């Protein structure tokens, strides 16, 4: 009995110690008198996420509540004290000027048990730096020009399928068909595979891409645990990727690589770049260790390129059409520009013609301001950092750093009438006057979005093809204002985007 009493006492003391430590962690900012909200015991400052609030709403509400109080507000990333940036000058320091102190994103990854988590977006340290350097060659202007005819080829099929949908019903849900377009583009450009999702909405590539983006392997409690105790989660062999998506993308990459190497096929695309990395050393660590890219690492890069590329571009195009349907004068101006430019290039959409569609670019940039697909940028502090001019505000080593770019894009101090769709915000004159960190849909600095050029190319070509042939208007099924999905980290419409479509 005495032994059991001692063991019980030890357990009680241990639990009490852990609860005390837990409580102290959740009062970190209050004890320093830094503005913050009272955190939830499990979710921290993410109370209601995926149930009653979208991620986007959380960043927006927090930013609007505390802006003007200091360079940042205290924020609890689940159980971890972190910061939410409130000042654009601090964002610039973190992303550009002091980048060496904030190079990592701090997201969970477990390459041993969850190989697709070893993607560029999640990698840290020297391995991220080496991988980024190698992959950058895939997204040069020359590579984009080479891929452009493929984009246009898929685009013509897209227009045909879109027209068929309109003939069946003048009310078209545009989000899904746009995602099928970008799925086929990326599948062809990255894998050299005909995905056929335009013809078949239930094609395997489309289904797996959709599931990888919108389905979670864990519920809110599991996500909170993984993000709060990353090292323990790795010891417990926890994964974040859906099992089916993992098997699918590993299989596709293995089969594609084997076929190309056996038949000596080169397509000068993303997969070729990965094959080159597989067959040449990649510096992996600070010690200078060099290794070849494995099939699993190749699959991870292909996975993020596919998943991020099809969803972000299709979402941007969908929201652009949503706004153009509400602003017929702007839509008419874009159409006039597209028709004039296409006429100038003998009725063809070419890589060079895209550069002449200046107002279309402004529409896309303004859409990305109002509907920032990734509404927050994540970083992790690598060493204690005192905010210049604010000795009270210190970011400790290991703290999560959140830059709520979606909320900043709707700040009236940065953009007049910030909730109004106005492509003139991105006229050449205004862009020259604006600091680059005041527009962050692709991030900024050395860790900006590596696929930015590809995403913009998809959006430009897809919208130019559509607007040249179709007129878009709102209808009874159009949700105004838009309601965001609560289930995904990226912004997307909860109910789809329904628009009335007519041929021009």
Curated annotation (Swiss-Prot):
Q: Which domain of life is it from?
A: Eukaryota
What's the gene? Cyp6a9
Which organism does this sequence originate in? Drosophila melanogaster (Fruit fly)
Q: What is this protein called?
A: Cytochrome P450 6a9
Q: Which class of enzymes does this protein belong to? A: oxidoreductase
**Keyword presence, Metal-binding:** yes
For this UniProt entry, the molecular function terms from Gene Ontology, in alphabetical order, are: heme binding; iron ion binding; monooxygenase activity; oxidoreductase activity, acting on paired donors, with incorporation or reduction of molecular oxygen
User: What CDD domains does the database record attribute to this sequence?
Assistant: CYP6-like
In the record, the note on similarity to other proteins reads: Belongs to the cytochrome P450 family.
What GO CC terms are in its UniProt record?
endoplasmic reticulum membrane
